[in-house]
């Protein structure tokens, strides 16, 4: 019986406060010309349990590449992304691409390639393991 008490304490102290999910994203609401808004001053905390994704919009125009980034709800982001899919042709003039992602700062610059990624923890793997552990914990609490 004491094992259940320890498990309940562990779940209460470490898992339940973390159920309020908040993500950080890069945000520049106004289009930025040739500035991908990926420096620290553009980092924001998204609205807890509402804005669960980061969104990136890239428009290629004759003047240069325009960027807009923000926090978004998964529904709004996925609808916008799907709606503009036919206009997304990277490298072509007047292309508009909208992408959605759900890991911290995922709408920032592409990470620099550093040798083998086998030793690095991939965010999607970490998220999967985290949710699996949460499910196990809730099943036993």
Curated annotation (Swiss-Prot):
InterPro entries: LY6_UPA_recep-like, Snake_toxin-like_sf. It holds the Pfam family UPAR_LY6. Glycans are attached at residue 45. It is found in: Cell membrane. Its main location: membrane. Interacts with CHRNA4 and nAChRs containing alpha-4:beta-2 (CHRNA4:CHRNB2) and alpha-7 (CHRNA7) subunits. One of its GO terms (biological process) is protein localization to plasma membrane. One of its GO terms (molecular function) is acetylcholine receptor binding. Residues 1-20 form the signal peptide. Residues 116-141 form a propeptide. This is Ly6/PLAUR domain-containing protein 1. A lipid is attached at residue 115 (GPI-anchor amidated glycine). Keywords: Cell membrane, Disulfide bond, Glycoprotein, GPI-anchor, Lipoprotein, Membrane, Signal. It is a lipid-anchor; GPI-anchor. It comes from Rattus norvegicus. Disulfide bonds join 25-54, 28-37, 46-71, 77-100, 88-97, 101-106. GO terms for cellular component: membrane; plasma membrane; side of membrane; synapse. Residues 25-108 form the UPAR/Ly6 domain. It comes from the Eukaryota. Believed to act as a modulator of nicotinic acetylcholine receptors (nAChRs) activity. In vitro increases receptor desensitization and decreases affinity for ACh of alpha-4:beta-2-containing nAChRs. May play a role in the intracellular trafficking of alpha-4:beta-2 and alpha-7-containing nAChRs and may inhibit their expression at the cell surface. May be involved in the control of anxiety. CDD domains: TFP_LU_ECD_LYPD1.
